[in-house]
Amino acid sequence: MQNKISTINYDSLDMLNHLLDISDEFNVSCLLNSNKFSHDKYSKYSWIFALGSIDYLSYNVGDKYSILENFLKRNISEWKFTYLSYDLKNKFENLTSNNIDNLEFYDLFLFVPKFIIKAGIKGLELEINSKVSNEEAINFKNTLTEIRKRVNKKNSISLSFKHRITKEQYIESICKIRSDIKYGDIYEMNFCQEFYIENTIINPIEIYKKLNEHSPSPFSTYFKENEHFIMSASPERYIKKTGSKLISQPIKGTAKRAHTDDDARIRNKLQNSIKERAENIMIVDLVRNDLSRIKSSENVKVEELCEIYSFPHVHQMISTITTKINNKLSISDVLKSTFPMGSMTGAPKIKAMELIEKYETSKRGIFSGSVGYIDDKGDFDFNVIIRTLLYNAKNKYLSLTTGGAITYLSNAEQEYEESLLKAEAVFKMFGGN
């Protein structure tokens, strides 16, 4: 049986907020929100919201990979939504993850939704899985008619985060990483630190709304999987497949925008920064190598090198690398060669991941992993989980992780301040610290 597809005649933003409000009634849900950023020529939708599950897979590294592949084959003609933990790396390489983990997400969670609402150029479209009963389908459609106009709530949300490591510990680690670079073990490494709150009860939907209002981003995500929540303002695409074309768009290089004539100078300074360009090009080379490892990959090329994209609060240096692959290649084949993304590891990739485990104190989990969809034709689109709040409602634990690329030219004090600056943008948003 085919899924039932119909159009919905409501304002897109009103519907999006309504769906967020009712999403808590489902055990699983996923919002992928581009916030109407027009610069992304590869984006097909303004937003997609998936609710409920017909089938799902909770997967950890110790499980057989065939379990994942069988799930994908069983649901080959279905839409699927997923999160991927950074620690899925341990399935593809001889690596480990033994640092503290208070979030306890699965290494991979994948579900086939009951309902999908897509906001595209033709308006709103509702797709109901063929396995949903007529009664449940009618009830869901009725909930959509109960849409309410947006009310701009000014609820006060106060969050006060603790630092997982001290400034002295951070700087000591940077010095050791620079030593590893000096002796040729690596060229560059992404080093991160965690900020956290224990014994806290939050409303993840309201947190996401405030995060997205303050920092609208092209790969924004809200994901609920039972007691686990992802609230992300990600600006970065990990990988996208459209037909036989794969696209990867790593970010390396960020500058805070100014609301004055000085903004153009800041943009040009980023564009011409030797340090930022060097970091970006190193990751481009790593991504090119990853894409070339994919079975049937050919004609790997850099379509954009160190281009500057401007967002409401920051300018970002983004490169675009593409390749041609066999159209029938699945996401599992692509993951084996490219995950985790090079922008969140360093180069050489495996050695950088070994040193990340050595110097960082928290298990990354979903941070620097990915959220995305696989459609009914096998095309997919995945983001990079950065600028993200992660929450375990059962453990009452909220986490934020920030970091940056470390090279031999890095100044430990400056790197610490940059990492703190990224965190403080969230702290100030929620009136804490």
Please name every model-derived segment:
Residues M1-N433:
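Extended alpha-helical targeting/anchoring segments
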